Amino acid sequence: MLIGVGTDIVQIPRIEKILNIYQELFAKKILALKELKQFTLLNKTNHATFLAKRFSAKEAVSKAFGVGIGRGINFKDITILNDNLGKPTVEISSHYTNKLAPFNIHLSLSDDYPICIAFAIIESNC
């Protein structure tokens, strides 16, 4: 059963401007620990695109839950990783998932400078 659908679009230059002002503080604000480890290993030229994709993915997932960021779920409650083939995977913190029936999240990410887009579908396992 479909729980929700969410999408988000981010202008990568917007993230570049934020990085120029706040540097890595922005990354620390939106990235979960596993993501932050990936971020620190990247070449700085890839930082803005990485953050734009994570930002848009987290917004899309929160919208698919029907709440949005800051209304029951926060940036660090959502972790976006990639499997061995590069497919994005989503982990949700247990303090949020304890309130819900089992579910699956499907996430698609794409970027073509200057735009990044994320599309999320959440379905029930029941």
From Swiss-Prot:
First-tier enzyme category under EC: transferase
One example of a Gene Ontology biological process annotation: fatty acid biosynthetic process
Recorded catalytic activity of this chain's protein: apo-[ACP] + CoA = holo-[ACP] + adenosine 3',5'-bisphosphate + H(+)
Names of the cofactor(s): Mg(2+)
Ligand binding (Mg(2+)): 8, 59
UniProt cross-references to InterPro entries, sorted A to Z: 4-PPantetheinyl_Trfase_dom (IPR008278), 4-PPantetheinyl_Trfase_dom_sf (IPR037143), ACPS (IPR002582), Ppantetheine-prot_Trfase_dom (IPR004568)
Localization per record: Cytoplasm
Tree of life domain: Bacteria
Family label: Belongs to the P-Pant transferase superfamily. AcpS family.
UniProt protein name: Holo-[acyl-carrier-protein] synthase
Gene source species: Rickettsia prowazekii (strain Madrid E)
Gene name in the database record: acpS
